[in-house]
Amino acid sequence: MSADAGAGAPLPRLCCLEKGPNGYGFHLHGEKGKVGQYIRLVEPGSPAEKSGLLAGDRLVEVNGENVEKETHQQVVNRIRAALNSVRLLVVDPETDERLQKLGVQVREEMLRAQEGPGQAEPPAAAAEERGAGGENEPPAAAPEPREAEQSPQERRELRPRLCAMKKGPNGYGFNLHSDKSKPGQFIRAVDPDSPAEASGLRAQDRIVEVNGVCVEGKPHGEVVSAIKAGGDEAKLLVVDRETDEFFKKCKVIPSQEHLQGPLPEPITNGEIEKENSPEALAETASESPMPPLARTASSDTSEELNSQDSPKKQDSTAPSSTSSSSSDPVLDFSISLAVAKERAHQKRVSKRAPQMDWSKKNELFSNL
């Protein structure tokens, strides 16, 4: 049997993963009617993708221990017990089927018999084709400086992607789902060798347009109906996680116009804070006259804000606002409503004519 395996028979793959800040980056699940645990989803840019792990792979061994007959929870516990690194022996569906027909039991020794050091290269080569970077440690560090630099060249890469596909015998080959924690419709998994994978569609992509129609904010059912309405062809405009965050910072919805040409500029927090700063709002209030209703509301608000101030504090601030309060006490926002009313009353009293002495009144009327 080992001779058959050595004579051009398909081989399993050994994927060595180093845990990242978000874990290994793959989802494990069991399939109905099948024995064993399968890789359901591999997150882009994760240690799992860089190791060559693919969605649809069947897990055979964990750190050299066969797990084909173990339950889902047993396999999960075994992977967790490995701490910061794990070694997974997997087979893709085609290899699995051919090895079962040959009656070959999948084991890690098969790779050692086939020039162990050299046999670890094919998974890395497959990872390079998928844009994951090299073999283990050195290639994994390559993308990180690019993310830290954030040069204009990198910004040009933050574009939406137009994935055009034709339906195959098993459909398009991707699963759509919605996430409760964030709006939008996302690609949950892409089947290997499917029209979706050939079009460049990737797991975790968010759908923006379906056949040229924007589906932002539409529910899951409407997006599915829009895809089905395309018949045997579909054109999906999608964004990956990083591109999605970039366009959200720019306050712009991605479109096919962004496939080429200039990209929008992100709106910085500094500009927003400057526009909403108290100084800017004060300048705007002083330059533009306020309607009567707004004046009343402002005076009520100032009363509420200064209700905790002591009388001494109000007296100390009064001289600085005498010029504005003498012309119109209602416009003085630094005093309370009660003080403003009192000043208005004093102003009306001060405008009255002085009272005349009774003797002068009698003398005036007697002359008449």
From Swiss-Prot:
Lineage, broadest ranks: Eukaryota, Metazoa, Chordata, Craniata, Vertebrata
Disulfide bonds: none
Modified-residue entries (N-acetylserine), positions: 2
Gene Ontology terms for molecular function: beta-2 adrenergic receptor binding; beta-catenin binding; channel activator activity; chloride channel regulator activity; dopamine receptor binding; growth factor receptor binding; identical protein binding; PDZ domain binding
Gene name for this UniProt entry: NHERF1
Cell membrane as UniProt keyword: yes
Phosphothreonine modified-residue sites: 301
Low complexity biased stretches: 113-126, 316-329
Protein name listed in UniProt: Na(+)/H(+) exchange regulatory cofactor NHE-RF1
Polar residues composition-biased segments: 296-309
GO terms for cellular component: apical plasma membrane; brush border membrane; cell periphery; cytoplasm; endomembrane system; extracellular region; filopodium; membrane
One GO BP annotation of this record: plasma membrane organization
